[in-house]
Amino acid sequence: MLHLSLVVTGGNADTAGSATFFDLPYASYAFDLIAGPDNWRLIADAPGDRGIICGALDPSAATSDPPEVLVWAAHYAASTGGRGLDRVGLANASSLAGIDRESARAKLRLLADAARIASAATPDELARLLDPRAVDIRSAALGRYEKPPERRPGGRQER
């Protein structure tokens, strides 16, 4: 049986309404989330039995794509509609034809690495593979990783 997939690219399509897309017989949808960041609204409305491919890798050479952003995109899409990671993919947002070959390869390596990280078996493993500032509120606030203070028995912190 053929897998029907619809690619939505080039800008925000959320104003067309969810039914425009999800009343159609597609099994999965690829959304450009760089040119169309409001497409997250469509992803949030997508039925949980439909696959979602997050086009979250910026196609321009001048941008740096931290893996944490791609991992967040995968996990957020997985959390919508009870979808789960088995129905989520990561992709470049649009063509990489406008950048040189080595930059395109580097972006594709990053995309593959982010997919590997997003598939971590446990939350602890996921946290270990990411920049601590992305998963630890204290580190995010400080702008650097700092272990939390040790706690003494009875709940009081050591200073």
Predicted features by range, described:
Residues 1, 13-20:
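N-terminal active-site wall of soluble small-molecule enzyme domains
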Residues 1-9, 52:
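Short beta-strand/loop segments at the ligand-binding rim of alpha/beta enzyme cores
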Residues 11-15, 36-38:
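Short acidic loop-to-helix transition motifs that present clustered carboxylates
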Residues 116-159:
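Extended, intrinsically disordered, low-complexity segments
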